[in-house]
Swiss-Prot record:
This is Fluoride-specific ion channel FluC. It comes from Methanococcus vannielii (strain ATCC 35089 / DSM 1224 / JCM 13029 / OCM 148 / SB). One of its GO terms (molecular function) is fluoride channel activity. PANTHER family: FLUORIDE EXPORT PROTEIN 1-RELATED. Na(+) is not transported, but it plays an essential structural role and its presence is essential for fluoride channel function. HAMAP family: FluC. InterPro entries: FluC. Keywords: Cell membrane, Ion channel, Ion transport, Membrane, Metal-binding, Sodium, Transmembrane, Transmembrane helix, Transport. The lineage of its organism: Archaea, Methanobacteriati, Methanobacteriota, Methanomada group, Methanococci.
Amino acid sequence: MKEYFLIGIGGFTGAVLRYVISGIIPVKFGIPTGTLMVNLIGSFIVGFLMYSSLFTGISYEYRLFIITGFCGALTTFSTFSYESFSLLEQHYFIKSGINILTNVTGCISMIYFGRMVSSSFW
């Protein structure tokens, strides 16, 4: 039961932060940059914590709270998919392609960057 509570509190916090960040960061050049930003931030955190957990003994509960709850709610694959599809539907093929490319390569890069930053501590 404790695990569900931790995931729920983390999820609530991540969802609220996603709402705030997406509201603050406007669409730039027709690309939904708020969604991109939350996905990049979440990917960095996951990369950092997953690598750190190999060396620090970060508890399973803490990882549930941060990675499953907080980052799971902060990041949003469904919104990214919807926004990319919406751009395609409006015949903004290049903008949709840029959105897809920047989200996928950016998030993978942020996982790597988070891991590299973490490795500098351990």
